[in-house]
Amino acid sequence: MKFFVDSANIEEIQELQNLNLVDGVTTNPSLILKSGRNILEVTKEICTLVVHGPVSAEVAATEFEDIMKEAAVLANIADNICIKLPLTFDGLKACKALTAQGLKTNLTLCFSANQALLAAKAGATFISPFVGRLDDYGINGSDLLHEIRTIYNNYSFETQILAASIRTINHVKEAALSGADVATIPPTILKALIKHPLTEKGLQSFLEDWKKTGQNIA
């Protein structure tokens, strides 16, 4: 399973990249706003940090012709750009056209298995089901991941399932259990995966016992 960082903050991405925990990056208009940076400038900088992984940059347009124009600008930033598109009629149309051009695409804001099926038919590189946002509406987001996995396996679709809207460490576990290809994770959640109270308690116990031995390793 691959881990993408859901962030447009250079410092956050760099810190995780140094631990070899980053397989890619996803951004969206909200994250760009939070960064306070120009989308083209910050996206180019991110692409230099994650040379071997895709970086999703989202169009702001909603009409086909405008989507294609913005996609051309974003695709020109770097070879590892993945064009993020809304899961709408025009978004699907653009996905088909961009895929034909050999560009990577990420259809976002997926909330149903039917939408995911259409994304695969359109040749999307990634489909982004929003797990946490479904949970907010009282719908189990992990169930959607399982449904999409089943459909994609049934028909050998190559579109990768990119679990998005990850709010908790449990969402990451659910994504892995469902067979999602990728989870895009906020930096705070990714770091939280490392922690467990029993690990910390056990380490403290070992350190206390080690002091009692009076030894030094180096």
Swiss-Prot record:
<keyword id="KW-0963">Cytoplasm</keyword>
<keyword id="KW-0570">Pentose shunt</keyword>
<dbReference type="GO" id="GO:0005975">
    <property type="term" value="P:carbohydrate metabolic process"/>
</dbReference>
<dbReference type="InterPro" id="IPR001585">
    <property type="entry name" value="TAL/FSA"/>
</dbReference>
<comment type="similarity">
    <text>Belongs to the transaldolase family. Type 3B subfamily.</text>
</comment>
<keyword id="KW-0808">Transferase</keyword>
<dbReference type="GO" id="GO:0016832">
    <property type="term" value="F:aldehyde-lyase activity"/>
</dbReference>
<feature type="active site" description="Schiff-base intermediate with substrate">
    <location>
        <position position="84"/>
    </location>
</feature>
<dbReference type="GO" id="GO:0005737">
    <property type="term" value="C:cytoplasm"/>
</dbReference>
<dbReference type="InterPro" id="IPR022999">
    <property type="entry name" value="Transaldolase_3B"/>
</dbReference>
<dbReference type="InterPro" id="IPR004731">
    <property type="entry name" value="Transaldolase_3B/F6P_aldolase"/>
</dbReference>
<dbReference type="InterPro" id="IPR033919">
    <property type="entry name" value="TSA/FSA_arc/bac"/>
</dbReference>
<dbReference type="Pfam" id="PF00923">
    <property type="entry name" value="TAL_FSA"/>
</dbReference>
<dbReference type="GO" id="GO:0004801">
    <property type="term" value="F:transaldolase activity"/>
</dbReference>
<comment type="function">
    <text>Transaldolase is important for the balance of metabolites in the pentose-phosphate pathway.</text>
</comment>
<dbReference type="InterPro" id="IPR013785">
    <property type="entry name" value="Aldolase_TIM"/>
</dbReference>
<protein>
    <recommendedName>
        <fullName>Probable transaldolase</fullName>
        <ecNumber>2.2.1.2</ecNumber>
    </recommendedName>
</protein>
<comment type="pathway">
    <text>Carbohydrate degradation; pentose phosphate pathway; D-glyceraldehyde 3-phosphate and beta-D-fructose 6-phosphate from D-ribose 5-phosphate and D-xylulose 5-phosphate (non-oxidative stage): step 2/3.</text>
</comment>
<dbReference type="GO" id="GO:0006098">
    <property type="term" value="P:pentose-phosphate shunt"/>
</dbReference>
<dbReference type="InterPro" id="IPR018225">
    <property type="entry name" value="Transaldolase_AS"/>
</dbReference>
<keyword id="KW-0704">Schiff base</keyword>
